UniProtKB/Swiss-Prot annotation:
Protein name: Virion membrane protein OPG140
Annotated GO CC locations: membrane; viral envelope; virion membrane
Keyword Disulfide bond: yes
Segments in the Intravirion topological domain: 1-10, 66-90
């Protein structure tokens, strides 16, 4: 299955997963900072990794939605056919 088609089918699920990862990064950071003992590396790594993955997924979904609105293949080919004569398209 094509990756873009799969993302198009599960767009809202992937976007929600990115938002959940951002929320989890905040929770992990809160757990790490609220402890009175010295912080452990596990909570820091979980917080940083979930933040990075959440940002990548969320920004990727925004870029994908803009690609679908402005650069989808059926839109681009439609613009080419309406702006040019049949001779120049061939």
């Amino acid at each position: 299955m094509d990756m873009m088609l799969m993302i198009g089918n599960y767009f809202s699920g992937v976007l929600i997963a990115g938002i959940i990862l951002l929320i989890l990064s905040c929770i992990f950071a809160f757990i790490d900072f609220s402890k009175s003992t010295s912080p452990t590396r596990t909570w820091k790594v979980l917080s940083i990794m979930s933040f990075i993955l959440g940002i990548i997924i969320t920004v990727g979904m925004l870029i994908y939605s803009m690609w679908g609105k402005h650069c989808a293949p059926h839109r681009v080919s439609g613009v080419i056919h309406t702006n040019h004569s049949d001779i120049s398209v061939n």
